[in-house]
Amino acid sequence: MSLSVVILAAGKGTRMRSSLPKVLHSVAEKPMVGHVIDSARQLGASNIYVVYGFGGDVLKATLTKDNTGDDLTFVEQVEQLGTGHAVDQASPFLTDDEDVLVLYGDVPLTKVSTLESLLAAKPTDGMALLTVHLANPMGYGRIVRQEISGKQQVVGIIEQKDANEEQLKINEANTGILLANGGDLKRWLSNLSSDNAQGEYYLTDIIAAAHGEGKVVATAHPETEIEVEGANNRVQLATLERAYQARIAEELMIAGASLRDPARIDVRGNLTTGTEVSIDINCIFEGEVSLADNVQIGANCIIKNSTIGANVEIKPNSIIEDTIIEADCSVGPFARLRPGSVMKQDSHVGNFVEMKKTTLGVGSKAGHLSYLGNAEIGTKVNIGAGTITCNYDGVNKSTTEIGDNAFIGSNSSLVAPVIIGNSATVGAGSVISKEVEDNDLALTRAKQRNIAGWQRPVKKS
């Protein structure tokens, strides 16, 4: 049976004190609702309906930009009249012969495995709820059960404000996440009433309707409470962030990575690691990052959308973005590799070296205090301290080519476009603006002049 997912995302989130819709606040640099959409897709949903209200234009623009595919449909809830009313806005799109899963845009940490257990729990002619047992269920709707045919069956959900003293003692709480047949769901939604303490159309009232028709209401449960917690303010959002990062850290360690302090790593995308990978404190990984075997990451590094080869050492305080680093390289400390950088095998970039759109050849080295932009550098090249590729003339950027085995002396400026030949040498302090042929020595600095007996000026008292 096909599956559609309805994601409720209409809440304003007043307690966030923000102009953004609540569901667009981020966990790991992704909107909360983005995590929910990812889960729906991993479940194989044919259609995903996002029910929006406040801030609809920015929500649609954000999700359209970040989510490709034709499985996403936006449905407006003009008036916020309760969860039942919100789901009902998607009813015209739902078919009778599909299953419909209801999720929440501000509950981003529900595991796909938990949702799969909910799908498996649903009877053919019934529905399924995700419930959780809480030590303090204050504010949650309570699951009401009765003994039927020797089993404690779900017969309804009572909201906190409508519960009596006995019902408030129930510690099995409703998460709001449920699964039902499309035809059944539409029928139950059409019969909802707002005759309750909130004056709203409760989605939870469909449970009693299902029981009244003799349908079995099955339940499934998350492994941990945090899976079904939402964020109504920034404190709760921070709690979700740390829980998410703790989950990722645990997965990395189980996969074989060593984390110096699991509480001090942030993964804001997808990080894959090989064996014997070591990550020191306060490192941030963004986008798609791959670390091969035996990679060592020092403290305070930021790595974004990059591939790091085997046996590479990234020393502390280095920033790497959209870069490919091949095996056996070393980087930093305090290096910056900007988009388009490539370090070939066994090359080295040292402290305070910046690269952009540059390839550093096999075995080549740039040890200190250099800027290498729009450069193609051959094998076994030595880049002296303070070398600058002058790649920008105020309008266009040009390329510097440095051949194999070249030696660039310290404090040199290479004015692009320029070619330095194989085994060529550039003397320290030179400004090179013309081609240097293979095996040539290029010098442009002024001849040294010594003045004997020179007296420095004396300050007047």
UniProtKB/Swiss-Prot annotation:
Catalytic activity entry: alpha-D-glucosamine 1-phosphate + acetyl-CoA = N-acetyl-alpha-D-glucosamine 1-phosphate + CoA + H(+); N-acetyl-alpha-D-glucosamine 1-phosphate + UTP + H(+) = UDP-N-acetyl-alpha-D-glucosamine + diphosphate
Cofactor binding note from Swiss-Prot or TrEMBL: Binds 1 Mg(2+) ion per subunit.
Compartment(s): Cytoplasm
Required cofactor(s): Mg(2+)
SUPFAM superfamilies cross-referenced by the UniProt entry: Nucleotide-diphospho-sugar transferases (SSF53448), Trimeric LpxA-like enzymes (SSF51161)
Single GO biological process annotation from the record: cell wall organization
EC numbers for this chain: 2.7.7.23, 2.3.1.157
Molecular function as annotated in GO: glucosamine-1-phosphate N-acetyltransferase activity; magnesium ion binding; UDP-N-acetylglucosamine diphosphorylase activity
Protein name: Bifunctional protein GlmU
Origin species: Colwellia psychrerythraea (strain 34H / ATCC BAA-681) (Vibrio psychroerythus)
